[in-house]
A protein has these predicted regions:
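Conserved glycine-rich Rossmann-like NAD(P)H-binding loop of the short-chain dehydrogenase/reductase
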Residues: 26-37
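Short, conserved active-site loop motifs that form the nucleotide-linked donor/cofactor pocket
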Residues: 50-52
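Conserved Rossmann-fold NAD(P)-dependent oxidoreductase catalytic core, especially the SDR/UDP-sugar
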Residues: 100-120
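N-terminal Rossmann NAD(P)H-binding glycine-rich loop of SDR-like oxidoreductase domains
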Residues: 4-24
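Residues at the starts of beta-strands that form the adenosine-phosphate
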Residues: 3, 27, 114
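Conserved internal alpha-helix in NAD(P)-dependent oxidoreductase domains
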Residues: 88, 92-99, 113
Length: 120
């Protein structure tokens, strides 16, 4: 069985990727920080219950390390997209969070075969 991590799994695109992978028979780990500005009521009901859900932040090295354990492919959809611009937060989450994930993969020599990154 293939093992995938979807970051930003509570978002529109991330949640659909989770659903598709589960339908295709993948073992899916779903990571999202459940940003209160977007997810006021906590974990959304639309997150596929067959996926292992981890509430965690891309800026938290321990959360990223735990989420990557046993994973073969990463669908990286996590991004801060608030509607009250906070430039420093955008940079920390969207750029430095991605860089931190890549550093963890390299430093721990994780056997990730592929990373699919959403970007703008």
């Amino acid at each position: 069985m293939k093992h995938a991590l979807v970051t930003g799994a509570a978002g529109l695109i991330g949640s659909h990727i989770v659903d598709l992978l589960v339908r295709e028979g993948w073992q899916v780990r779903a990571l999202d920080n459940l940003e209160p500005q977007t997810h006021r009521r906590g974990k959304p009901a639309w997150i596929n219950p067959k996926a292992e859900f981890i509430e965690g932040d891309m800026r938290n090295r321990d959360a990223i390390t735990a989420a990557l354990e046993g994973i073969e492919i990463v669908f990286h959809q996590a991004a801060y997209g608030g509607y009250m611009p906070e430039i420093a937060k955008y940079v920390h989450v969207n750029s430095l969070g991605t860089a931190q994930m890549l550093e963890v993969i390299r430093e721990k020599n994780l056997p990730i075969k592929k990373i699919v990154v959403a970007s703008s």
